[in-house]
Amino acid sequence: MHTYSFEKLEVWQLARTFRKSIYLLTAKFPKEETFGLISQIKRSVSSIGACLAEGSGKITMKDKAHYTNMAYTTTLETLNHLIAAMDLDYITNEEYLTYRSKIENITIKLSGLRNSQINASNP
């Protein structure tokens, strides 16, 4: 079976694991949030890996960097949703800090990837 380039990215693998953990986390949110916060956070966390996958199919490094940047911004969107979940007492402060740490790790790796893509497009 062929492995696509995005599947080899450590940051994509982290985003994949993070998505699963967020899906499991939101299962304990109140049912009235199904079409609100749950839907929003699932969409944003899914977009992290999706942007990396889509960007890997682009030809130029500048285009790849654009999609990596979009993955970065959706990671921050996910952070915002986690802050809302904490504010609404859907998650504890400890849970929030655990997920925030994972987000920081992902954003650091996304920044590094984006910088390498930008540098490769500007020799």
Model-derived features: positions:
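Amphipathic alpha-helical assembly/interaction segments
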Residues: M1-P123
